[in-house]
Amino acid sequence: MRIILLGPPGAGKGTQSERIVERYRVPQLSTGDMLRAAVAAGTPVGLEAKSIMESGGLVPDAVVVGIVADRIEEADARDGFILDGFPRTVEQAKALDAMLAEKGIALDAVVEFVVDENALVGRIAKRAEETAARGQPVRKDDTPEVFKTRLDAYKRQTAPLSDYYAGTGLLRKIDGMKPIDEVTGDVTGLLDGFREKATS
């Protein structure tokens, strides 16, 4: 099972991907973790990424795709993986598609968590209030202002992926506003269907 998770910050991707990992025993691949691991392991793409990051540059798509390519060759990812946080742009999606096609690997689905923006901002504001009421420091990215900025960046950069993957026939939308366990039920219902198809 090979899937990509999409959705704005605060949509519950983290919680759902943990549950998918637990249920289906496939690794969650986060580009940040993969970059750090590749740098630590001293792989050719890791060394390239390291020199770019040390000079303060942004790691180009080709290098990130190279790191993803190396990671999905590892034993634990052979039967499937969850990509979370990548691709972020249509250009990255196209580069990922080309790399997977070269390896003869097909994605099963792109799961997008659809949420109401105003409700999301309200959810974050409530979380910040509750944290402050407990006398704990509020995380900087948990303030409504910062969250709104992250949401705007997502809409500008990543939201077009929804149209891109809809065009490939891979996009599946899940209502992320339901209670967490109901969302999990919708996700597992969808993924169980893919698994049955793969084994039949």
UniProtKB/Swiss-Prot annotation:
Sequence segments annotated as region (LID): 126-142
EC annotation from Swiss-Prot or TrEMBL: 2.7.4.3
Name of a matching Pfam family: ADK
Residues given in the record as AMP binding sites: 31, 36, 57-59, 85-88, 92, 139, 150
Stored SUPFAM superfamilies: P-loop containing nucleoside triphosphate hydrolases
Major location category of this protein: cytoplasm
CDD domains: ADK
Reactions accelerated catalytically: AMP + ATP = 2 ADP
Record has Cytoplasm as a keyword: yes
Record keywords: ATP-binding, Cytoplasm, Kinase, Nucleotide biosynthesis, Nucleotide-binding, Transferase
Molecular function in Gene Ontology: adenylate kinase activity; ATP binding
Any Gene Ontology CC annotation: cytoplasm
Pathway(s) per entry: Purine metabolism; AMP biosynthesis via salvage pathway; AMP from ADP: step 1/1
Localization: Cytoplasm
Domain of life per record: Bacteria
Family designation: Belongs to the adenylate kinase family.
Physiological role: Catalyzes the reversible transfer of the terminal phosphate group between ATP and AMP. Plays an important role in cellular energy homeostasis and in adenine nucleotide metabolism.
Quaternary structure note: Monomer.
Domain notes: Consists of three domains, a large central CORE domain and two small peripheral domains, NMPbind and LID, which undergo movements during catalysis. The LID domain closes over the site of phosphoryl transfer upon ATP binding. Assembling and dissambling the active center during each catalytic cycle provides an effective means to prevent ATP hydrolysis.
Descriptive protein name: Adenylate kinase
